[in-house]
Amino acid sequence: MTDALTPVVLWRPHCPFCRILFSGIERQGLEVETRNIWEDDDARELLNRRIGSETVPTVLVGDEILVNPSITELMAALREANK
């Protein structure tokens, strides 16, 4: 895989699903960009514009949007995006 995409994780504090995803990201050693929707107005607006809600975690992988993905789903999306 060359020119690997960096996933963008939209999240918020106290989100148990976000903690689960971040745990998987850490185990896999992935580099991600994180954007806290409670502190980043642009991230919150992006989330509302792209999916029409503030459901987190939402991960952007290129043009693909993953809402509350498992680490397995995220890894599959990265493999597909980096083909």
Language model regions located:
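Local sequence-structure signature of Cys/Sec-based thiol-disulfide redox active-site neighborhoods
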Residues: 1-28
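Short secondary-structure transition/capping segments
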Residues: 2-3, 45-48
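Short active-site oxyanion
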Residues: 6-8, 31-34, 63-65
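Short alpha-helical
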Residues: 16-17, 42, 73
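Class I S-adenosyl-L-methionine
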Residues: 19-26, 48, 75, 79
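Thiol-based oxidoreductase modules, predominantly thioredoxin-like and allied folds used
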Residues: 31-44
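Structural micro-motif
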Residues: 51-59
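Non-catalytic, surface beta->alpha helical segment in thiol-disulfide oxidoreductase systems
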Residues: 61-83
